[in-house]
């Protein structure tokens, strides 16, 4: 492969993206020279992909002291370089809505997704590092990921971040002010970040992709105002409004309470994408008819968590019934099964809602959540219990509720040590995996080098199913089923 001049090759590709013309070549040359350092003009490359070219320019800048050695500093420069191939926010929005109206919503969405990958806002190469596998369980095929895409902070970055003065700008990583933000040691680079504006019930919202996607076309819908997460009747209206505007996507919201909520409760937002989760495939276990809403198909879903599914053609009726279920749940207690609406003035009940279109009808899944703690379960009664926390101890948020486990990076190395232990080899297995590993040893009599990896995957899937069962309010036994029935009777069902 012929060597080409790195800077010239990068500039050629920038011009090909049509934000600049040949007339801008000298301007681009000098701007990039300033960012990366003189001398780069002599550097050659064999690479062709623009992201690879960007990485080589960043590497040169690090070697010549134009940018620091921490990953965040390098990301800031990388995003600034990729900003050259990213149109201005006004142009991105203009193109999106022109395509949406004149061609199709699907094409507009696809173009924006392609741009977000092309300009390295979606970190496709980092995402490819994630470990992923499906596991068959009694609830269907659950999905397991070990999340290796997000770079862990290096010691230099941590030390520098401690010295930095606190900044209140942007207020959080979901604020609109992130669009084009340079980034800093303790805050991600967003120079190449773009947000599509859209109207939702007379309010402006934003649509963007997730840089470290957990599934196909993982996107975020965000309130343009920085206000806390809140599940209300308006939430159901918003979710159903979004799936009508963004065909092919599901959308859901994290719960609005600690323990059962997501990692960001301070800014109203939803997550969506083009992916079919195990929960969506799960069948109705018990059919229901709610009084006054006989046109809505409803039922309890066969799922480890407690899910009521509603399906119908009338958005208004679905929103009204979902709101009735939410309001009933917020005030509902059943001490026989440790279900408590509030204690000491603290509310415990909320819902994790998910909306999708299926066979032309609107569908809502309402997952009942309870964030109580107890002496026995200080992390949460309906949260992964201590015996499974060696695998998963973090909150069970929207994505996991639907059947996709997001497991911590530490497990990659730790599970290799568990494999060695199961094979009787010398190992450094963490003590907290001991009971689990011994159970696996007892369960399988023929563990070998050939099958040990598959066995670990199957057992991880079983642990994740247990994690979801722990998070489920009504358990899959006679007591749980009867208690769930008492709740839906409280909402008002027709026998």
From Swiss-Prot:
The record's section on PROSITE patterns has:
GAL_P_UDP_TRANSF_II
Biological process GO annotation list? galactose metabolic process
Keyword annotations for this protein, in alphabetical order, are: Carbohydrate metabolism, Cytoplasm, Galactose metabolism, Nucleotidyltransferase, Transferase
Kindly give the InterPro entries that the UniProt entry links to this protein.
Answer: GalP_uridyl_Trfase_II, GalP_uridyl_Trfase_II_CS, GalP_Utransf_C, GalP_Utransf_N
**Catalytic reaction(s) noted:** alpha-D-galactose 1-phosphate + UDP-alpha-D-glucose = alpha-D-glucose 1-phosphate + UDP-alpha-D-galactose
Q: Where in the cell is it found?
A: Cytoplasm
Protein origin, superkingdom: Bacteria
Q: Which GO terms describe its cellular component?
A: cytoplasm
Give the E.C. number(s).
2.7.7.12
Q: Which NCBIfam families match?
A: galT_2, PRK05270.1-2, PRK05270.1-5, PRK05270.2-2
Q: What family does the Swiss-Prot or TrEMBL record give for this protein?
A: Belongs to the galactose-1-phosphate uridylyltransferase type 2 family.
Extract the HAMAP family matched here.
GalP_UDP_trans (MF_00571)
Q: What is this protein called?
A: Galactose-1-phosphate uridylyltransferase
**Naturally occurring in which organism (per UniProt):** Ligilactobacillus salivarius (strain UCC118)
